[in-house]
């Protein structure tokens, strides 16, 4: 097996039974690929595909002027290099973007000969700025990281559905169809309760569908011919005969005696016609059946009937036959007659009935009716009517089905080909109506709109493209207007275009769209989950209020595509989903999931991705089906799925098998060990709460994991990966330098990679992002190996919480209702200490009275308050500050006030300056204590920098120079090594230190020379001489390149900053706050078992084991049975085994056991069950490192749905606690429980308790952020009551129920002061304050302000109300 650098150091023992050959795909590939398709930045202009920006440009261009003499064509586009890198954009508050320039060609035609080109002008036009995606799939917009969430929306195409009988009181099913384009008007068809078929455009007023059919060019005869079969009759003097069609007679009631050709009665009147009767008629070779006139009356004429002599129309198509009409026809000598065939069962007369309600006569009248419906009140001019109708469904400018839409329409209407025009055709409309009528006649099925074959995902690229198109279409309109002037005023392409509309459309989308969200950066998992989220909300999606149960529910097609577990609790449940682990999008935007192919019950390694529609055809087995050694399905019957149904089938019928048991869940859910033993609701909470885990100061890998921790950590981008393999050359806390392997460098490339680590940086959620190197100088790393750990990662594995020894038992009520009791030792060891970084900023503006100044010179401030500020008035890095301390001194000019004579005198004596400025310094907010870790000063162009700003720039440049010097050092070292190899043993023509001609060059001679003088040696061989020259010039070129890079960096740093208008200077101060665990903090396991810390008990009071070790956490056993999340118990047992095995390894290491003994024990641990590890191929040194890392516990992986069995857990416990150890610890025989002792009395508890190790997380709901107190503060303007909430420094609400409580106690005085002086009696509360200051404790309650508000409210309703005082 191939282990990475970090994997080999600490191998995770996996219980997986199935070897999964199909690797989990790169978890943020969806985002990256989608945006790369949109930009196509790395493709040459000529070979770009028509998608993304290219598609937007080609659809908007060419633009032709209204007079047709000028035309603008698009040639190509290019994206420039971004001016600042990601880190610089975050610091300065810029957007990480690239300028888009399009090359366009302006062609002007000759007015005399319009086909002749008069002149052609080509130039590049600036088209605005396009935000770029960072390598981790996020965007930096105005300095903050954001994510564009993918949207799940209804796919374009045609859909058939019914109202489930809810519309009409009779419960009749009303069928409807809807054609949804990607953009353009929606077309709906619907039946009403009377079975008349209507259509609507864009949900406007409904009209009979035959109006639309006439508008597309059909007349009444054609309409009937399209929708009905015809019955043929021959008329005779008294009655007639009907053509005999067997299918149409079967099941009918005979309304007259039916005779065969010979006049024999075959079917008597009022009898139901059955198959026997039909056979008799066929046996008698019956061609026609005689019918009386009554049978003809009431039937509907299928074609216009014309008098052969006069040419007069006797009956129109769709007229009913009456006795009079029959007489007229016989008089006119009409012999043949066609009527439409209908019956009540499977061919209703719906279109015929609809045609009767339609009053339009011809195509034009029908189009005018549609025009009036869409544009009420406008006169229908023939041209306007024609243009409107064409633009509705037939024009590519206004209507676009899209490739997906065309594919869905063709497949739903059962057409063989999947391609076609992107606009609607008359056939599409006709076929849709036919399908809808068939549905009403009972043929076919309605569509399921929640099926993932009918919902598609719009990714970042597509959403951005739509915005870009919208901006481009505004530009197009403006250009069209100005093109007319192009020839007369001799304008260039860039004079005609204005990029503002494009920029504003893009800026609006990335800045404020509902789908552009502030990235959740609490920990690596929350980051990755946010990028894999799929939302049904947003523009063009669902509304939260209107989404019903069906849309939110889990659907069979979610299997392997969307996670059935991970979705938020609350109003968004089911509307926001997460992508399943292996899911990906196909070219049409539908979700696909991989399966392994099975043929003749043999499972192959071929992996096929299927969408929800394709999957329905196949029989698919689950991943846990038993497979024998030869790769065949072993069971007689295999559990399988087909089209959403589960069944047991024989192995021969299986077409595919799942690639992995974890394929149905998302990344977060697949990190929950023993997920299969948890109730679904709790699993949901567990998956969601992992995203809220705060990164701890000392990350600790979970002892019980699922094996996915490494993948999530690597894909999230928090850890640093080696871009190329090589040897570690230098390591410190800030950077890692790797000398790259020769075979991974190309000629002329720098053979050195420098990784600058992120140190103590603030995340979006104020948590701390910090990277720590995990390699040593001399280590050999391969490409993709982890070089440095990030936040919440431990040796390249995700580590969200800490492994705690837990006991399940009640403890004096301190774990009542899910509370958690924690040992003081946990706090003392800094297990849950986390660092939070607050960003505080202050700006100096130009005001009308003069400019604000950042300075140390502030009057009325004691020197002790200024002691932490430097001469520029900015706090030192490393200063420890608390609430109220000054961070940045700032003074603001004050308006001149009229002075009293006394003040004038004082001013005259003590000098002028003091009072015309006021102190507006930046201070530490209330409730915050911390250390200053960074300060950034931004100064506007043209304003002199202060000393602090200059020193910051100097430091930054020094750091940059250090990196360049490192690269140069390695490059030069490499070059001189090559030079030495080249020269030694060669004959010289001369050289420094009087080297004689013809001398052989040796090592000693070169060692004596200064490095750079070696280039002055003149080899006799010309070939060697030219190689020496090449090495020299490559070094010089590199030096020059590095110097240029340094100068560029200096320019960037020294140019003025782009600040908001009126701002001259901005200072950002970063404050690191250490948060220790304390009562009130929320904690949780990974199984939805959450609670609040109730007490931190001294370690000596905690229950302890027989060997004297106290437990870390005491949990309430009552939290398990009713919640049915038994996974936590299994995790606890397996964690206990992991810790016990760690202790055994630790003992062996301490006693310096022999290598062979250690190796044997490790082989026993790893290879008894589950996945086999390749321990034999480890070197002794690697075994030592592995054992060293296992001393804290052997990490286990129990993959979701394929995890450790009870027997395996038992076996691991036996290995961990041999008989004598188990006895000494007073364990039960199963080793899953033990007798504990009470820490306060030392007595044993009377029964064993479950003890083990659980991975427990500290969540982002910290009591420090919620704790808040107020004495006096701001009041609401209208009601004069105190505001609410910590952010407003508000008071505590004394609500309706609290008032009842005081009433119940009869505490009238308390109640009175609550409702008056403590709330909104303005005069009373001021008086109380005065009284308290004077030391008098009396209150005088007055009128609450809210009563006056009530009086005003009632008066506003026009009721006079006055307060009378007695």
Swiss-Prot record:
Keyword field: DNA-directed RNA polymerase, Nucleotidyltransferase, Transcription, Transferase
Example GO biological process: DNA-templated transcription
Catalytic activity of the protein: RNA(n) + a ribonucleoside 5'-triphosphate = RNA(n+1) + diphosphate
Keyword Transferase recorded: yes
Keyword check for Transcription: yes
Function: DNA-dependent RNA polymerase catalyzes the transcription of DNA into RNA using the four ribonucleoside triphosphates as substrates.
Protein name stated in the entry: DNA-directed RNA polymerase subunit beta
Source organism: Polynucleobacter necessarius subsp. necessarius (strain STIR1)
Lineage of producing organism: Bacteria, Pseudomonadati, Pseudomonadota, Betaproteobacteria, Burkholderiales
């Amino acid at each position: 097996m191939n282990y990475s650098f970090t994997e080999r150091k600490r191998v995770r023992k996996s219980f997986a039974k199935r070897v999964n050959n199909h690797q989990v795909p790169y978890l943020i590939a969806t985002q990256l690929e989608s945006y790369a398709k949109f930009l196509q930045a790395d493709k040459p202009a000529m070979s770009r595909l028509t998608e993304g920006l290219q598609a937007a440009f080609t659809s908007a261009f060419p633009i032709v002027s209204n007079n047709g003499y000028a035309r603008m064509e698009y040639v190509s586009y290019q994206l420039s290099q971004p001016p600042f890198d990601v880190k610089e954009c975050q610091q300065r508050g810029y957007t990480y973007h690239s300028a888009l320039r399009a090359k366009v060609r302006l062609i002007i035609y000759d007015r005399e000969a319009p086909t002749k080109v008069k002149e052609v002008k080509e130039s590049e036009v600036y088209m605005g700025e396009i935000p770029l995606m960072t390598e981790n799939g996020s965007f930096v917009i105005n300095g903050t990281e954001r994510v564009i969430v993918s949207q799940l929306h209804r796919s374009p195409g045609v859909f058939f559905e019914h109202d489930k009988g809810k519309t009409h009181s009779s419960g009749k099913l009303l069928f409807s169809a809807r054609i949804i384009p990607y953009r353009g008007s929606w077309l709906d068809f619907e039946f009403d309760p009377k079975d008349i078929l209507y259509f609507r455009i864009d949900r406007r007023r409904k009209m009979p569908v035959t109006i639309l059919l006439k508008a597309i060019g059909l007349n009444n005869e054609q309409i009937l011919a399209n929708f009905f079969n015809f019955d043929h009759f021959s008329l005779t003097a008294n009655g007639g005969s009907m053509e005999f069609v067997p299918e149409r007679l079967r099941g009918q009631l005979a309304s007259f005696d039916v005779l065969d050709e010979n006049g024999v009665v075959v079917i008597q009147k009022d009898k139901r016609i059955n198959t026997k009767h039909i056979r008799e008629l066929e046996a008698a070779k019956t061609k026609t059946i005689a019918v009386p006139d009554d049978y003809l009356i009431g039937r509907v004429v299928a074609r216009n009937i014309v008098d052969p002599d006069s040419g007069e129309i006797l009956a129109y198509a769709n007229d009913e036959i009456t006795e009079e009409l029959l007489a007229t026809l016989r008089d006119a000598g009409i012999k043949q007659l066609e009527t439409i065939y209908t019956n009540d069962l499977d061919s209703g007369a719906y279109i015929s009935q609809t045609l009767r309600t339609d009053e339009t006569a011809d195509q034009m009248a029908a189009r005018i009716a549609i025009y009036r419906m869409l544009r009420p009140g406008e006169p229908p001019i023939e041209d306007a009517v024609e243009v409107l109708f064409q633009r509705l469904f037939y024009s590519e400018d206004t209507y676009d089905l899209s490739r997906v839409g065309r594919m869905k329409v063709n497949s739903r209407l059962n057409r063989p080909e999947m391609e076609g025009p992107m606009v609607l055709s008359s056939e599409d409309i006709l076929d849709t109506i036919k399908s809808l009528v068939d549905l009403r006649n009972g043929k076919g099925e309605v569509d399921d709109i929640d099926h993932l074959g009918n919902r598609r995902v719009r990714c970042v690229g597509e959403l951005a493209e739509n915005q870009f198109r919208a901006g481009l279409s505004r530009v197009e309109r403006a250009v069209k207007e100005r093109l007319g002037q192009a020839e007369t005023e001799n304008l260039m392409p860039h004079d005609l275009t204005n990029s503002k509309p494009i920029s504003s459309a893009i800026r609006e989308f990335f800045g404020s769209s509902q789908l552009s969200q502030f990235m959740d950066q609490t920990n690596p998992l929350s980051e990755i989950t946010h990028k894999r989220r799929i939302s049904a909300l947003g523009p063009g999606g669902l509304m939260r209020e209107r989404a019903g149960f069906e849309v939110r529910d889990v659907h069979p097609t979610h299997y392997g595509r969307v996670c059935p577990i991970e979705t938020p609790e609350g109003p968004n449940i089911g509307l926001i989903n997460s992508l399943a682990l292996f899911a990906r999008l196909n070219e049409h935007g539908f979700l696909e999931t991989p399966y392994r192919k099975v043929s003749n019950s043999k499972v192959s390694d071929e992996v096929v991705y299927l969408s929800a529609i394709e999957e329905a055809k196949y029989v698919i087995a689950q991943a846990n089906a038993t497979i024998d050694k030869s790769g065949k399905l072993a069971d007689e019957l295999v559990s399988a799925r087909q089209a959403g149904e589960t069944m047991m089938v024989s192995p021969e019928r299986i077409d595919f098998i799942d690639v992995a048991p974890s394929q149905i869940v998302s990344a977060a859910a697949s990190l929950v060990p023993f997920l299969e033993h948890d109730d679904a609701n709790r699993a949901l909470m567990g998956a969601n709460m992992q995203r809220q885990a705060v990164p701890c100061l000392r990350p600790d890998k979970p002892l019980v994991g699922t094996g996915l921790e490494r993948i999530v950590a690597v894909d999230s981008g928090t850890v640093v990966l080696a871009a190329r393999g090589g040897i570690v050359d230098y390591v410190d806390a800030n950077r890692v330098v790797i000398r790259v392997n020769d075979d991974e460098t190309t000629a002329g490339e720098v053979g050195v990679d420098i990784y600058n680590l992120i140190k103590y940086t603030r995340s979006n959620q104020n948590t701390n992002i910090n990277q720590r190197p995990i390699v040593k100088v001399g280590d050999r790393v391969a490409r993709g190996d982890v070089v440095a750990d990030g936040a919440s990662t431990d040796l390249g594995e995700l580590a969200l919480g800490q492994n705690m020894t837990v006991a399940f038992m009640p403890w004096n009520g301190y774990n009542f209702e899910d509370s958690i009791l924690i040992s003081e030792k946990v706090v003392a060891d800094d297990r849950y200490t986390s660092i939070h970084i607050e960003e505080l900023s202050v700006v100096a503006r130009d005001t009308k009275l003069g400019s604000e100044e950042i300075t140390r010179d502030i009057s009325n401030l004691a020197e002790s308050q200024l002691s932490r500020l430097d001469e520029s008035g900015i706090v030192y890095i490393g200063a420890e500050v608390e609430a109220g301390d000054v961070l940045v001194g700032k003074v603001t000019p004050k308006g001149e006030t009229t002075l009293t004579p006394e003040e004038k005198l004082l001013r005259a004596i003590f000098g002028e300056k003091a009072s015309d400025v006021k102190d507006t310094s930046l201070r530490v907010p209330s409730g915050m204590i911390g250390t200053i870790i960074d300060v950034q000063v931004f100064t506007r162009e043209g304003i002199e920098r202060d000393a602090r700003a200059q020193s910051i720039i100097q430091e930054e440049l020094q750091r940059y120079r250090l990196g360049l010097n490192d690269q140069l050092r390695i490059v030069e070292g490499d070059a001189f090594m090559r030079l030495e190899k080249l020269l030694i043993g060669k004959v010289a023509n001369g050289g420094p230190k009087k080297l004689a001609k013809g001398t052989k060059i040796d090592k000693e001679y070169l060692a004596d020379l200064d490095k750079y003088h070696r280039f002055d040696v003149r080899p006799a061989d010309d070939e060697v001489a030219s190689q020496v020259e090449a090495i020299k010039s490559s070094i010089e070129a590199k030096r020059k390149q590095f110097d240029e890079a340094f100068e560029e960096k200096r320019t960037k740093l020294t140019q003025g900053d782009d600040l908001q208008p009126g701002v001259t200077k901005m200072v950002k101060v970063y404050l690191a706050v250490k948060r220790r665990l304390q009562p009130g903090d929320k904690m949780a396991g990974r199984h939805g078992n959450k609670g609040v810390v109730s007490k931190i008990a001294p370690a000596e009071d905690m229950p302890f084991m027989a060997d004297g070790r106290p437990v870390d956490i005491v949990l309430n056993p009552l939290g398990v049975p009713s919640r049915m999340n038994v996974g936590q118990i299994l995790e606890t047992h397996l964690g206990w085994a992991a810790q016990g095995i760690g202790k055994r390894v630790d003992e062996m290491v301490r006693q310096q056991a022999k290598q062979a003994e250690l190796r044997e024990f490790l082989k026993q641990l790893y290879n008894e069950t589950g996945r086999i590890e390749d321990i034999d191929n480890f070197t002794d040194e690697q075994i030592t490192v592995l054992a060293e890392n296992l001393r804290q516990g052997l990490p286990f992986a129990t993959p979701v749905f394929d995890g450790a069995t009870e027997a395996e857990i038992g076996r691991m416990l036996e290995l961990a606690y041999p008989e004598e150890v188990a006895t000494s610890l007073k364990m039960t025989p199963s080793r899953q429980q033990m007798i504990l002792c009470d820490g306060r009395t030392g007595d044993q508890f009377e029964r064993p308790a479950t003890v083990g190790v659980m991975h427990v997380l500290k969540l982002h709901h910290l009591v420090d952020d919620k704790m808040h107190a107020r004495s006096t503060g701001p009041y609401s303007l209208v009601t004069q009551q105190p505001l609410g909430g910590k952010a407003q420094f508000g008071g505590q609400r004394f609500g309706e129920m609290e008032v009842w409580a005081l009433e119940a106690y009869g505490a009238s005085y308390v109640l009175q002061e609550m409702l008056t002086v403590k709330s909104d009696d303005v005069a009373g509360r001021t008086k109380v304050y005065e009284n308290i200051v004077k030391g008098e404790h009396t209150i005088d309650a007055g009128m609450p302000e809210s009563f006056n508000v009530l009086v005003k409210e009632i008066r506003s309703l026009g009721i006079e109300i006055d307060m009378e005082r007695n």
